[in-house]
Amino acid sequence: MAKYLGIDVGATWTRAILVDEGGSVLSRAKIRTGVSPVAEIAEVVAGWDFDAVGVGSIGPMDLKTGVVVNSPNSPSRRFPLVEPLKKFKRPVVVANDCVAAVWGEYVFKYHVDNMAYLTLSTGVGVGAIVNGVLLLGKDGNAHELGHAVIDFKSPRRCGCGGLGHFEAFVGGANMPSFYQEVAGEGPLLPEEIFKRAREGYRKAVEFLDVWLDALAAGVATILAAYDPELLIVGGSIALNNWDIVGRELPKRLVKYLGVRGAEIRPASFGDDEVAIGAAALAYKTPETLKKFGYPR
C-alpha cells in the first residue's frame, strides 16, 4: 500500500505524519517552527519511506513558486516549501494550511461538496470547497479571510499591518492585547483567559462575550462568501475550548447572518488536521492545484 508524507508548517510547530491510503497515521514527528521549517523537518523524516509528499503551510504564499511570502506570524516571513523536498525525488504538492485541512476532511471524512474550514490558532485561516472544487485564487490565497475587515473603524492592527481584520480580534497572537484593551488589565494568554472565564472571573467572562461576537461576525463573512453546508472549525483555541466555542458560536451567528447558516463541527483529526490534509493533497491532488503545476 502506498504511503504519503504530510507536513504541517504552523506559526509555532511544524509537524510531519506518514499515512496510508485510508488516512491511518503510521508515524509522527514535531519540531519548533524555525526560519526554514520545511528544510528542518525534512532532516527529521529523512529515513521515512513514502511515495509522495504534501505540505500545508501558513501563508500567504505564491503557489507558482512554492514559496511563503510575507507571513505575519512565523519566525521567517519568507521561506521555500518545494525546494527543500526535491532531494527525496518524490512528487511534491503544496497549499495553504487551511486548504490542506479542508481537503483532508473532504478526502478522508465527509465528502461534502460544499464545505469550509476555519482555524483558530496563533492566526486565523480559512479553506473552502465549492461545488466539489477546491478554491485557490490566482496565487493560492483565495481563502485568506483572517484578513477580512470586520470593523472598519477599529484601530486594532493585524500582524500583516492591516486594520480591523478578523484575525486582529480573534487570533491567538492578538488575544492578549485585545483582552488588555477590553478588560483594562493583563495582557493574558488565551488559555488563561478561558481558564479564568470558567472560574467565573467577571472580566474574563465579559471579554469572551466580546470575543465570541467578533468570532461570530467573522464566521458570518465566511458563510456569506462560500455558502457551505458544513463548517469545520479547528486550531488549538477552538478545539481546547470547544465546550464554549461550539456552544456559543451557532447562537451568536444568528444576528449576523442574512443567509442560511451551516452545520458547525469540530475538526476531525485534532493536532494532525493540517498534516493529514497535506497527505491528502499528495494522495488525491485536486484539479485546481494541477493547474499550478503540481505535483512537482
Curated annotation (Swiss-Prot):
Entry note: thermal dependence: Optimum temperature is 95 degrees Celsius. Highly thermostable.
Function: Catalyzes the phosphorylation of D-glucose to D-glucose 6-phosphate using ATP as the phosphate donor. Has a broad hexose specificity, and in addition to glucose, which shows the highest catalytic efficiency, it can also phosphorylate fructose, mannose, galactose and sorbitol. Can also use CTP, GTP or UTP as phosphoryl donor.
Entry annotated with the keyword Transferase: yes
EC number: 2.7.1.2
Domain of life: Archaea
Annotated NCBIfam families: GK_Pyrobac (NF045551)
Essential cofactor(s): a divalent metal cation
Gene3D superfamilies: 3.30.420.40
Co-factor note (free text): Mg(2+) is the most effective ion.
Catalytic activity: D-glucose + ATP = D-glucose 6-phosphate + ADP + H(+)
Family of the protein in this entry: Belongs to the ROK (NagC/XylR) family.
Organism, scientific name: Pyrobaculum calidifontis (strain DSM 21063 / JCM 11548 / VA1)
pH profile of the protein: Optimum pH is 8.0-8.5.
Sample GO molecular function, one term: glucokinase activity
Keywords annotated in UniProt: ATP-binding, Carbohydrate metabolism, Glucose metabolism, Kinase, Magnesium, Nucleotide-binding, Transferase
Assembly with partners or alone: Homodimer.
Name this polypeptide is given: Glucokinase
